Amino acid sequence: MLNRTVLVGRLTKDPELRSTPNGVNVGTFTLAVNRTFTNAQGEREADFINVVVFKKQAENVKNYLSKGSLAGVDGRLQTRNYENKDGQRVFVTEVVADSVQFLEPKNNNQQQNNNYQQQRQTQTGNNPFDNNADSIEDLPF
Protein backbone atom coordinates (compact mmCIF):
# COMPACT_ATOMS: atom_id res chain seq x y z
CA MET A 1 0.00 0.00 0.00
CA LEU A 2 1.16 3.50 -0.75
CA ASN A 3 0.22 6.83 0.83
CA ARG A 4 2.32 9.52 -0.85
CA THR A 5 1.40 13.12 -1.64
CA VAL A 6 3.45 15.56 -3.72
CA LEU A 7 2.21 19.14 -4.02
CA VAL A 8 3.44 22.43 -5.44
CA GLY A 9 1.56 25.60 -4.63
CA ARG A 10 1.52 28.96 -2.87
CA LEU A 11 0.87 29.64 0.80
CA THR A 12 -2.48 31.33 1.43
CA LYS A 13 -1.23 33.05 4.61
CA ASP A 14 1.83 33.12 6.84
CA PRO A 15 2.62 29.77 8.49
CA GLU A 16 1.73 29.25 12.14
CA LEU A 17 4.14 27.70 14.65
CA ARG A 18 3.27 26.23 18.02
CA SER A 19 4.74 23.64 20.37
CA THR A 20 3.31 20.49 21.90
CA PRO A 21 3.42 20.05 25.71
CA ASN A 22 6.53 17.92 25.11
CA GLY A 23 8.26 20.81 23.29
CA VAL A 24 7.94 19.48 19.73
CA ASN A 25 7.50 22.28 17.19
CA VAL A 26 4.44 21.97 14.95
CA GLY A 27 3.99 24.19 11.90
CA THR A 28 0.79 24.53 9.90
CA PHE A 29 -0.01 26.27 6.65
CA THR A 30 -2.43 26.04 3.75
CA LEU A 31 -1.21 25.52 0.21
CA ALA A 32 -3.23 26.71 -2.81
CA VAL A 33 -2.64 24.17 -5.59
CA ASN A 34 -3.95 24.80 -9.10
CA ARG A 35 -5.90 22.04 -10.79
CA THR A 36 -4.63 20.84 -14.17
CA PHE A 37 -7.91 21.55 -15.95
CA THR A 38 -10.25 24.53 -16.36
CA ASN A 39 -13.89 24.83 -15.36
CA ALA A 40 -16.82 25.60 -17.71
CA GLN A 41 -15.92 29.32 -17.65
CA GLY A 42 -12.36 28.55 -18.74
CA GLU A 43 -10.90 29.43 -15.34
CA ARG A 44 -8.43 27.31 -13.44
CA GLU A 45 -9.63 26.38 -9.98
CA ALA A 46 -7.45 25.67 -6.97
CA ASP A 47 -7.59 23.29 -4.05
CA PHE A 48 -6.65 24.59 -0.60
CA ILE A 49 -4.76 21.88 1.22
CA ASN A 50 -3.79 21.99 4.90
CA VAL A 51 -0.22 20.92 5.65
CA VAL A 52 1.40 20.01 8.99
CA VAL A 53 5.17 19.89 9.51
CA PHE A 54 7.18 19.02 12.63
CA LYS A 55 10.42 19.81 14.49
CA LYS A 56 13.21 21.81 12.81
CA GLN A 57 11.42 21.88 9.47
CA ALA A 58 8.48 23.62 11.19
CA GLU A 59 10.85 26.36 12.37
CA ASN A 60 12.33 26.72 8.88
CA VAL A 61 8.88 27.02 7.33
CA LYS A 62 7.96 29.76 9.82
CA ASN A 63 11.23 31.63 9.26
CA TYR A 64 11.52 31.40 5.48
CA LEU A 65 8.02 31.11 4.01
CA SER A 66 5.21 33.64 4.03
CA LYS A 67 1.91 34.33 2.31
CA GLY A 68 2.36 33.88 -1.46
CA SER A 69 5.59 31.85 -1.21
CA LEU A 70 5.95 29.00 -3.70
CA ALA A 71 6.62 25.70 -1.93
CA GLY A 72 6.84 22.01 -2.72
CA VAL A 73 5.57 19.46 -0.20
CA ASP A 74 6.28 15.74 -0.08
CA GLY A 75 4.36 13.80 2.54
CA ARG A 76 1.40 11.60 3.33
CA LEU A 77 -2.33 12.17 3.60
CA GLN A 78 -3.75 11.72 7.08
CA THR A 79 -7.24 11.96 8.55
CA ARG A 80 -7.78 12.63 12.23
CA ASN A 81 -10.92 13.31 14.22
CA TYR A 82 -11.93 15.00 17.43
CA GLU A 83 -15.05 15.99 19.30
CA ASN A 84 -15.86 19.71 19.21
CA LYS A 85 -17.40 21.73 22.05
CA ASP A 86 -20.91 20.86 20.80
CA GLY A 87 -20.17 17.15 21.09
CA GLN A 88 -20.01 16.60 17.33
CA ARG A 89 -17.33 14.44 15.73
CA VAL A 90 -15.14 16.52 13.36
CA PHE A 91 -12.90 14.90 10.73
CA VAL A 92 -9.82 16.72 9.44
CA THR A 93 -7.81 15.59 6.41
CA GLU A 94 -4.35 17.10 6.01
CA VAL A 95 -0.94 16.39 4.54
CA VAL A 96 1.77 15.51 7.05
CA ALA A 97 4.92 16.77 5.36
CA ASP A 98 8.10 14.73 5.31
CA SER A 99 9.83 17.44 3.28
CA VAL A 100 9.07 21.06 2.38
CA GLN A 101 11.05 22.66 -0.44
CA PHE A 102 11.35 26.43 -0.76
CA LEU A 103 10.96 26.99 -4.51
CA GLU A 104 11.86 30.68 -4.63
CA PRO A 105 14.08 33.01 -2.60
CA LYS A 106 12.63 34.74 0.47
CA ASN A 107 11.02 38.11 -0.40
CA ASN A 108 11.05 37.18 -4.09
CA ASN A 109 7.85 39.15 -4.80
CA GLN A 110 9.39 42.33 -3.36
CA GLN A 111 12.64 41.70 -5.23
CA GLN A 112 10.81 41.27 -8.55
CA ASN A 113 9.02 44.59 -7.97
CA ASN A 114 12.34 46.33 -7.23
CA ASN A 115 13.90 44.88 -10.39
CA TYR A 116 10.96 46.17 -12.43
CA GLN A 117 11.34 49.67 -10.97
CA GLN A 118 15.10 49.66 -11.70
CA GLN A 119 14.45 48.53 -15.25
CA ARG A 120 11.95 51.36 -15.80
CA GLN A 121 14.42 53.92 -14.44
CA THR A 122 17.13 52.62 -16.76
CA GLN A 123 14.81 52.80 -19.75
CA THR A 124 13.91 56.42 -19.05
CA GLY A 125 17.52 57.47 -18.26
CA ASN A 126 20.44 58.11 -20.60
CA ASN A 127 20.83 55.23 -23.01
CA PRO A 128 24.34 54.97 -24.52
CA PHE A 129 22.94 53.07 -27.50
CA ASP A 130 20.27 55.64 -28.28
CA ASN A 131 20.37 56.92 -31.87
CA ASN A 132 21.23 60.49 -31.10
CA ALA A 133 21.72 62.59 -34.24
CA ASP A 134 23.88 65.17 -32.39
CA SER A 135 26.83 62.81 -31.95
CA ILE A 136 26.91 61.28 -35.45
CA GLU A 137 29.63 63.72 -36.61
CA ASP A 138 32.03 62.33 -34.00
CA LEU A 139 32.08 58.89 -35.62
CA PRO A 140 35.51 57.95 -37.14
CA PHE A 141 34.08 56.58 -40.38
Swiss-Prot record:
Composition bias, Low complexity: 107-127
Span of domain SSB: 1-104
CDD domains registered for this protein in UniProt: SSB_OBF (cd04496)
Subunit annotation: Homotetramer.
Keywords from the named record: DNA-binding
PANTHER family hit by this protein: SINGLE-STRANDED DNA-BINDING PROTEIN
GO BP: DNA replication
InterPro entries, sorted: NA-bd_OB-fold, Primosome_PriB/ssb, ssDNA-bd
One Gene Ontology cellular component: nucleoid
A GO molecular function held by the record: single-stranded DNA binding
Region (Disordered): 104-141
Gene symbol of the encoding locus: ssb-p
Name of the molecule in the record: Single-stranded DNA-binding protein 2
SUPFAM superfamilies documented for this protein: Nucleic acid-binding proteins (SSF50249)
